Amino acid sequence: YNEMHGYVEDMDGASMRDSVIGVSEDHKVGLALEKYNAQIKSVSYEVRSLDMSRLIEGGDDLQAEDDGKYLHVSLTLKDLLTQGEEYLLVLKVQTEDQDLVRFYSILTYLGTNHVQDCVDFAQRFHEMTLTGDSDGVLNYLEQDGSMDGKNLGYINIHSRSGPVTWGDMQVEQIGDPSLRFTELESDITALTMEYQVTNTEINEQYQVREAYRLRYTSTRIYLLAYERWTDKILEPGRQLVEDGKLSFGIQSSEPVYMKNTEENVVGFVEQGQLWSYDYGQNRLSLVYGFTDG
């Protein structure tokens, strides 16, 4: 849960709101640090106020278990956190090549909570979308006619059950979803899942992100909001022109692109990557971008 990325400079804590770590009544927080073959010299942590002006607690030279790929760190926080208040967790990692790498996450004390129940619900709903269980997802959708029912690139809680369960497209999930909490309160859990699927009929792959907002009660869990964004994963060398037009396939939004003066090369950004398409050579090229971190 909650993938975090390292920074080599101090960051503004108030803006580091990509994810939230919830602390249960045992005050334990487990962290797994992927080493990427780095030689790690020390690990320390701080819990600060969101504006970073006040140090709540900290610890140096943390003990860790090394399994070869990950360094596993377990924090037992002091009983200093106020329930419902947000703090900033800063994990500091010193390596042989880099003096200090910092990882940031919002931290909130939940005490007794039902976050795992909400996660289980989201995973069940997610499985229903993949297995084509239209009747199952229909129980939680709020169809109101605002969605056209044809676009698989973007669907939400107001969509019909057909598009939510991928319509006629046969999909298989690749690997496990990456889960991130974006909001944690006493009875509210908001999370995202990111994963890839394959269209098994035409062997195309798609990057998918789902967002859930859930409310737990003693009798049931309510799906308050649901969205899904799907984008075809582009591959260098693939042809994009169909009937003289660029065809990007399933996309969550229309790509923005620019042409050169001769109008024979098109550049566009898709999924954080810069691509170019040469009409003359009918060839797609990745100009700049990162994948898998």
Model-derived regions: residue spans:
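Core segments of small alpha/beta cavity-forming domains
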Residues: 2-45, 55, 86-168, 244-283, ...
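Contiguous hydrophobic, core-forming segments of folded domains
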Residues: 66-69, 74-98, 104-114, 120, ...
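Short, surface-exposed charged micro-motifs
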Residues: 180-181, 211-213, 265-266
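Acidic, serine/threonine-rich low-complexity disordered tracts
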Residues: 238-240
